[in-house]
């Protein structure tokens, strides 16, 4: 007579891979055109000046420039790229000549 029940099976034990969402380039950073700025689900961050939005809501730079995060409302923000730094003096990008 068996004194232990059968082990049975479980329906757990699976998980999906992480999607690597989030902000990829930060405020004040210099970015070349085409750089991914934010990967997101839905529009937590809205595209601003010189920023495009992909089919999956990815925001990317349309021009070379400096990233700027701007508030829209309490829970929404806009990401823009400006050719010149906004609001503060930043060092020149690597490889540029200084006079």
From Swiss-Prot:
Ranges that cross the membrane: none
InterPro entries: Ribosomal_bL27, Ribosomal_bL27_CS
Record's GO cellular component terms: cytosolic large ribosomal subunit
Keywords: Ribonucleoprotein, Ribosomal protein
GO molecular-function terms, A-Z: structural constituent of ribosome
Region (Disordered) residue spans: 1-21
Top-level taxon of origin: Bacteria
The family this protein is said to belong to: Belongs to the bacterial ribosomal protein bL27 family.
Record-given protein name: Large ribosomal subunit protein bL27
Source organism: Thermomicrobium roseum (strain ATCC 27502 / DSM 5159 / P-2)
